[in-house]
Amino acid sequence: MHEIITLQLGQQSNYLATHFWNAQESYFTYSEDQEPAVNHDIHWRPGIGADGTETYMPRTVIYDLKGGFGSMAKTNALYNDLEEGQTPQALWNGPTVLQKQPAIPQSAYQQSLDAGLEPPPLTTDTVRYWSDFNRVFYHPRSVVQLNEYELNSSIMPFERYATGEDLFASLDKEHDLLDRDLRPFIEEADQMQGIQVMTGLDDAWGGFAAKYLERIRDEYGKTAMFVWGSEQESVMRAGGLSREKRLLRLANKARTMTEVYKYASVVVPFTVPATLPGSVVLDAGSQWHNTALSAAAIESVTLPSRLRDPANRDTMATLADSLNAMGKQNVASLGMSFAPEPTEEEDVVMEGTQDFRQRQLLNQKSSRHAAVMVKENPEGVFLDINFTPTDQLDYVRRRGGGDDDRPRVFSQMLTSRGYEIDEQVQEAKEAEEDERFRRRSSYETVMKSYHTPLRFPLLDSFPQIFRDDSGEPLKRGGAINVTSSLSTDASVHKRLKSLRTTVGRSIGLEDREQLGNELAEMADEYHEGWSSGSDDGDDD
C-alpha cells in the first residue's frame, strides 16, 4: 500500500500537522460510487475501537512537551473504554506521586464537534493550542507527552540544540524510543514508502530530530525520509526577539542542518516570508495562521505520494531522486501560488464558450497548470510565495525582484491542483514527457509536474488568510486552486556560507572548525560556477 509514517516533533510542528490531517480527513468520501482522489490507506491505519467498530486513524507519532496537548486527552470516544485503567503513555517508569493540575477546558469549537453541532468560527483568540482546531481522532499510541520540559517555560526553556540532543539520548537509552513509539506503526505497514518528519530546525527540537533521524537511518537504511523543518522568523519578527536569541536560533539551525543533512532524503527549511502578496493576509504572531499557509503548500506539493491517479503518482523515493539529480543536493526550497475557486458564473462561461482566448483568461485567473508552467519556464518556475528562510541575523525583507535575482534551478517538481485540462495542457504534458526521454546535459534543469483536479479545501478549522480580487476573505467551506513546488537551486550555496559566517563567532572553538567545514561542504554541493544573477545582488 506504500504507507507513509509521520513523526510530529513539538508545538509548531503539531500546528502544521493538524492542518495537514484536517485536510486529509476532508477527502474521505462516503458514497460507494464515488472514489476519492487520494488513497487513504497511505496515511491512515485501520483498527478496532473499544466497542468493536472499525476505526481509521493517522499513521503518526505526536511528541510534545508537558502542557502542549492542550485539552486533548490521550484517549478519545473511540478508544476510551479500551484504555480505561491503563497508565497514560509518558516517558517515565519510576515512582509516581499523583498531582492533579486543573484541566485545560475544551474550546467551544471542540465542544461543538463532540456534540455533533455546527462549530462557531475560530479566531486567533480562541485557538490556544493546536488541539483547539483539530478535527481528527488519534490512536492512543500516537500521543507521547515528554514530561521533562514544560511548554513555554521560562525556568527551563526548551530552546537549545544540545538540550534536544540530550533529551533524546536519555529517553532513548531508557525506553528505546524508536522501538517503543515508531516501530509498531512501521511493522503494521505492508510496504512502507517512507517517513515524513515535521520538526523545528532552530530550537531544541532540531537536536531531538537529528538524533531520532540517526536512529531511523541505522535501522531502516534505504527508507525515504522527508524533513519539513519550520523556522519561526515571522513569529520572531512579530515579537521583537532579542539579537542574542536570534543568534541562538541561527546557531541551532546550523547544527541541525549539518546533522539532518546526513540522514534525510530531502530537507525543506521553511518559514512564512516577511513579504506576502496582497491576496494573503495573516497575523504573523499566530502559529495557527502561519502554519495554515505553510500547510497549504506542503499538503499540496506532497499530493503525488498519495494520489490514486497513476499518471500523477510517485513514491517519496522517486520524488527525492528527481530533486537530488546532481549529487548530494537534498536541501530543497518550498514555493506556492494560489487562486480562488472560479465563481459559478465563470464556470458557466468556461463550460459554454468556444472562445479560446476567453477560456484561457479564465483559466489564468485560476492560476496555471503545472505542465504549462514547466513548458513555458524550462529553467525553473518561481511562484508568488517563497518559504525559504533568509537566515539573516538582522531582518531583511526579501526582494521580490526580477530575473536577475533568480538563482539557477538544478531540479524542480511542481504540483498543481484544480485547473481545467485543455488542449494547451495536453500539449504541454506531452512535451514534458518527450523532454524526459531526451539526452540531457548536466547543466539543464530537471523538471517534473503533477496535477490533480482536487482543490485545497478551506475548512472551518482553517483561518481566513486568503483574499479574493476585491480583498474580501474567501469563505470557509470553499476551495482554492494551488500550485506548489519543491526546488533545489544555487541560492542554498550563499545562504549556507552566510550562516557559517554568522554563527561562527557564537560557537566554541571545539565545535567551530568542524561545523564550519560541514557547512562549507554542504554549500559546495550547490555551487555550479554560475547563477542567473550576481552573488552580490542577492539578499539571502
From Swiss-Prot:
One example of a Gene Ontology biological process annotation: mitochondrion organization
Coiled coil: none
Chief site of localization: mitochondrion
Cellular component terms per the entry's GO annotation: cytoplasm; mitochondrion
Keyword tags: Mitochondrion
Pfam families: Misat_Tub_SegII, Tubulin_3
Covalent S-S links between cysteines: none
Alphabetized InterPro entries for the sequence: DML1/Misato, DML1/Misato_tubulin, Misato_II_tubulin-like, Tubulin/FtsZ_GTPase_sf
Compartment(s): Mitochondrion
Region annotation (Disordered) ranges: 517-540
Function: Involved in the partitioning of the mitochondrial organelle and mitochondrial DNA (mtDNA) inheritance.
Family: Belongs to the misato family.
Record's protein name: Protein dml-1
Lineage of producing organism: Eukaryota, Fungi, Dikarya, Ascomycota, Pezizomycotina
